[in-house]
């Protein structure tokens, strides 16, 4: 075959593939007149017919659409289970997730979707979202500004689009007693943010990002949001060869300070949260992990203004366990919220899977209990269905499984507390500091001269066993 003929054949094949991909993004054939090229928000009837409100049926239930461990009104250690968790549905993963990936077209053709990105479609999607939360029994939701409303041709038009959708959300909230756990601005998808938002080398981009966060803060406040999150997916660098790190970090700090100032100006009493992540999409993000972020806040005088939103999958990407990140945040009094998800240990990227590991859930809940809960934060399911999960009921099953897993972890923590053996093991491990000299050291009065005298007096120390295997046995006994 000649080169020219081969080129024509390849182009034809490419066009056919593009057509096939596009076809998968169009309106599903089985919903007929409800789906038109000109999007309409006049959907009739339920979005999830045949699915009733999800109820607690106990551990013996074999019914997929029921809670086995999560009993919202049950009181455990002085709080209702729903108040320990304050569960939230993530709008973007749940209602904007398409199943598409770099190697394939979208796989999820939800019945209410019509293939457009119109305001009418955004309204229909919002209504489906609230019906989903009502049936799930979840009282909070989280959103990015650009996920709930489409971009316009100008910033003013985009803000007007957002206002229109927010009014609908406000109405739906008043009808359901559901409100945002947190809101945020999407500062990573649009090409203008390819070099970052608050760390962009272009001042016009910095100003645009500031305008977007200003609006998102105001919208979150208007909807009664309890928190506002900053996730800097592109606040970092690809190479240091073209990067002035000092200047970018200072710009980021000034941006966050401006957000603090605006929060106070509009009377927003919610908590500002920073969500650490080491990389992806940027090669190296500035908020690598909890410790790095805390150091940044200390350096720029922002402690007391921000807390941390720990995402478990981000923790593992940074080389830590979720438990480590939670404890680092907790002991520094900056634990504000948890994005409950997990990653796949066999891959090196952010897979955002629903957490179903009972052991991991128990460790997470041990930190939450020691923190006396997360309010005004909570647990947001920053997780998405697998690409191959395409049934509408899978949306419910995934959230039920995630909520049951966390509830089971919470019940396991009660077992550990009531048994007391693990806590006693830890106490005994440090009991040598429960002495006069130990108390002096912990009070910061252990000078080297005094300690040297003691070392000469005591001679070679006898070091006891760490009892790690026993600790693991005691922990496993509660699972």
Swiss-Prot record:
Its EC number is 5.3.1.5. The active site is at residue 144. Its cofactor is Mn(2+). Mn(2+) 2 binds at residues 311, 314, 350, 352. InterPro entries: Xyl_isomerase-like_sf, Xylose_isom_bac, Xylose_isomerase. GO terms for molecular function: metal ion binding; xylose isomerase activity. Optimum pH is 7.0-9.0. Mn(2+) 1 binds at residues 275, 311, 339, 382. This is Xylose isomerase. It comes from Hordeum vulgare (Barley).
């Amino acid at each position: 075959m000649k080169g020219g003929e081969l080129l024509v054949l390849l182009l034809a094949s490419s066009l056919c593939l593009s057509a096939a991909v596009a076809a998968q993004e169009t309106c599903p054939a089985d919903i007929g007149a409800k789906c038109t090229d000109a999007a309409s928000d006049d959907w009739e009837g339920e979005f999830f017919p045949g699915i009733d409100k999800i109820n607690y049926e106990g551990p013996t239930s074999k019914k997929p659409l029921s809670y086995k461990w999560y009993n919202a009104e049950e009181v455990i250690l002085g709080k209702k289970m729903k108040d320990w968790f304050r569960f939230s549905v993530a709008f973007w993963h749940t209602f904007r997730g398409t199943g598409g990936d770099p190697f394939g077209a979208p796989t999820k053709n939800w019945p209410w979707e019509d293939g457009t990105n119109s305001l009418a479609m955004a309204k229909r999607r919002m209504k489906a979202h609230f019906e989903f939360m009502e049936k799930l029994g979840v009282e909070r939701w989280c959103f990015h500004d650009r996920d709930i409303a489409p971009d316009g041709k100008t910033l003013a038009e985009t803000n007007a689009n957002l206002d229109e959708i927010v009014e609908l959300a406000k109405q739906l909230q008043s009808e359901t007693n559901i409100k945002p756990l947190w809101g945020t601005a999407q500062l990573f998808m649009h090409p203008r943010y390819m070099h970052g938002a608050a760390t962009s080398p272009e001042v016009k981009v910095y100003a645009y990002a500031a305008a977007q966060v200003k609006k998102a803060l105001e919208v979150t406040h208007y909807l009664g949001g309890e928190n506002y999150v900053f996730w800097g997916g592109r606040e970092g660098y690809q190479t240091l060869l073209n990067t002035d790190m000092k200047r970018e970090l200072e710009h980021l700090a000034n941006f966050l300070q401006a957000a603090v100032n605006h929060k106070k100006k509009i009377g927003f009493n919610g908590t500002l949260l920073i969500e650490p992540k080491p990389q992806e999409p940027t090669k190296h993000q500035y908020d690598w992990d909890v410790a790095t972020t805390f150091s940044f806040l200390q350096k720029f005088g922002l402690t007391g203004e921000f807390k941390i939103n720990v995402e478990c999958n981000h923790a593992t990407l940074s080389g830590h366990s979720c438990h480590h990140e939670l404890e680092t945040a907790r002991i520094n009094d900056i634990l504000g919220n948890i994005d409950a998800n997990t990653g796949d240990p066999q891959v090196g990227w952010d897979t955002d899977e629903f957490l179903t590991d009972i052991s991991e859930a128990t460790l997470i809940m041990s930190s939450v209990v020691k923190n006396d809960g997360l309010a005004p934060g909570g647990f947001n399911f920053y997780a998405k269905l697998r690409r191959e999960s395409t049934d509408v009921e899978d949306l419910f099953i995934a959230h039920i499984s995630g909520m049951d897993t966390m509830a089971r972890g919470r019940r396991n923590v009660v077992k550990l507390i009531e048994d007391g053996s693990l806590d006693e093991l830890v106490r005994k491990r440090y009991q040598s500091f429960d002495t006069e000299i130990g108390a002096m050291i912990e009070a910061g009065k252990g000078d080297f001269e005094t300690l040297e005298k003691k070392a000469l007096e005591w001679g070679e120390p006898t070091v006891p066993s760490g009892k790690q295997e026993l600790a693991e046995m005691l922990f496993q006994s509660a699972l």
